[in-house]
């Protein structure tokens, strides 16, 4: 029975990898979106700390799982910059680019907001992050199944 469960898990991992355009070994299953956000942010922050980088960029418009984790990281000495969100719920790649400093270790923004319908320019933000050598996380819970998610093309490091 354990072998069958392992095979099903591997099959699910391969299916998700095809959907997201990543390698199966890059898929980690969690109990849900909040745990995934927490794990991604805490892991990226720890990597940043090891490199002497303790600045994170996000927005005040994020899910509480992200905002609460950012608050906890601030208590650990991280600096968090919350970008202003336009009236339409958008944040531009230019805003992200202007906020990046040599100390920035992570950018985390919501892919889509289900309350107002905004879909952020994830590929452009991801490109800015990739060019700056900054990890990029997006909470895509509300986007999954509605818009294409391609972690390679959109330069997403953590999802």
Positions of PLM-derived features:
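Pyridoxal 5′-phosphate
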Residues: 1-159
């Amino acid at each position: 029975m354990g072998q069958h469960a392992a095979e099903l898990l591997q099959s699910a991992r391969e299916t998700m990898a095809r959907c997201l355009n990543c390698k199966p070994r890059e898929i980690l299953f969690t109990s849900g979106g909040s745990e995934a956000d927490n794990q991604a942010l805490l892991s990226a922050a720890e990597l940043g700390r090891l490199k002497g980088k303790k600045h994170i960029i996000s927005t005040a418009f994020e899910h509480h799982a992200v905002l609460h984790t950012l608050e906890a990281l601030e208590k650990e000495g991280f600096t968090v910059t919350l970008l202003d969100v336009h009236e339409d719920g958008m944040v531009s790649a230019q805003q992200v680019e202007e906020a990046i400093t040599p100390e920035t270790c992570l950018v985390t923004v919501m892919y889509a907001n289900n309350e107002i319908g905004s879909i952020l320019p994830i590929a452009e933000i991801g490109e800015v992050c990739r060019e700056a050598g900054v990890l990029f996380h997006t909470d895509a819970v509300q986007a999954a199944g509605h818009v294409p998610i391609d972690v390679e093309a959109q330069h997403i490091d953590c999802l």
